[in-house]
Amino acid sequence: MTTKGILGKKVGMTQVFTENGELVPVTVVKVDSNVVLQVKTMENDGYEAIQLGFDDLREVLTNKPAKGHAAKANTTPKRFVREIRDVELGEYKVGDEVKADIFEAGDFVDVTGTSKGHGFQGSIKRNGQHRGPMAHGSRYHRRPGSMGVIINRVMKGKLLPGRMGGNRVTIQNLEIVKADTENGVLLIKGNVPGANKSLVTIKSTVK
């Protein structure tokens, strides 16, 4: 099965009405300025993929190799460069612009992003554990609980406090509500991972 993919920037969430009058929550993703920087083939690279660049970057913030790589595609250096595998290579050439119209309303996609970081958090917030009783005589409120018995070490996999969020997350089978080519925007039903203005990768669903 061939895959279609595009890079975008999460703008935020809003609501739209369907033709039936149903109110649908959607995430707005800006997907303009996607350019094919490189086409990777089985002969040269050992696998097939296209390399997309997204979000123009000022030249003062880049280096010579990045400028030269972008110049081969007749474009400016890009802030984000990602690969999309399992595509139909015959449909792409270096320098082509990939737009929102590769998807249409009703398509299902997988969206990958970086979840919001929450810093160091305790077991209750991080792992969804129950707290202890809050009564006057209790001395156990929000602690992580027993470390186990007998052996003098903590078992692997024990749910403990630590850094929360900031992970690569993929949400599968999200529906495209609208593909606005004129404004370079995709409206995706529901929420997608990450904070506003963060990078998301949108690909055809695999399931």
UniProtKB/Swiss-Prot annotation:
Any Gene Ontology biological process: translation
The keyword Cell inner membrane is annotated on this UniProt entry: no
Pfam families assigned: Ribosomal_L3 (PF00297)
GO function term, MF aspect, one: structural constituent of ribosome
Renumbered residue ranges of the record's region Disordered: 119-143
InterPro entries assigned to the protein according to its UniProt record, in alphabetical order: Ribosomal_uL3 (IPR000597), Ribosomal_uL3_bac/org-type (IPR019927), Ribosomal_uL3_CS (IPR019926), Transl_B-barrel_sf (IPR009000)
Gene Ontology CC entries for this record: cytosolic large ribosomal subunit
Self-association and partners: Part of the 50S ribosomal subunit. Forms a cluster with proteins L14 and L19.
Family note: Belongs to the universal ribosomal protein uL3 family.
Protein name: Large ribosomal subunit protein uL3
Gene: rplC
